[in-house]
Amino acid sequence: MALPALVAAAAPAVIGGIASYFGQQETNAANAKLAVWQTRENQAEAARNRKWQEQMSNSAHQREANDLQTAGLNRLLTATGGASTPSGGQGQAAGATMENSLKAGITTAFEAKQLGMQIERQEKELQNLAAQTRKLNIDAKVAEKRIPESDLKTKFTTNFSPVIDRVINLEDSNGPRLSNLREEKKPNQMPLKNGKLNT
């Protein structure tokens, strides 16, 4: 493969790899920002819950006394410990999903190269199929032309063989058989023309 063709074949893979690398860098940065934001939001919500728990805990006796009075009971029964304090939320830190940018770029470049090789192989297979199809078409045309010729030879041989055999086997009353004349003919002897030897 010539160098320009090699560069042209490798260019999409390299460009795809670089794009994947920088794309993964952007994704990682966005994931990190999102994780920081989620952590801050979770911590703020946890702080609000702790404040609410503290308020509930600080007002436990007052709430219990009010509840007892509303129920028509003596407020002094609050000496038992106060109303229960519900549990609140806890802050959680979010983890960012981080991917290896270089791996993404290499993987994309490798996949692009494999795709290029696969396309090239398929193109060659299509060229081979086209060549085979052309050969089969040519063979079919040759066979079509030979079949009538072969049929004609077969018909000729079938129809004229008996006639030829009779001519060869005829006996001339004044001379030898024609088949014997063939055997006696000398290789350098020229046929007769007007009763004279043609030289």
UniProtKB/Swiss-Prot annotation:
Domain of life: Viruses
Location(s), subcellular: Virion
Record keywords: Capsid protein, Host-virus interaction, Viral genome ejection through host cell envelope, Viral penetration into host cytoplasm, Virion, Virus entry into host cell
GO annotation, biological process: symbiont entry into host cell
Residue segments, region Disordered: 171-199
GO cellular component, one term: viral capsid
Assigned protein family: Belongs to the microviridae H protein family.
Function according to Swiss-Prot or TrEMBL: Probably triggers with protein G the injection of the phage DNA into the host upon conformational changes induced by virus-host receptor interaction.
UniProt-recorded name of the protein: Minor spike protein H
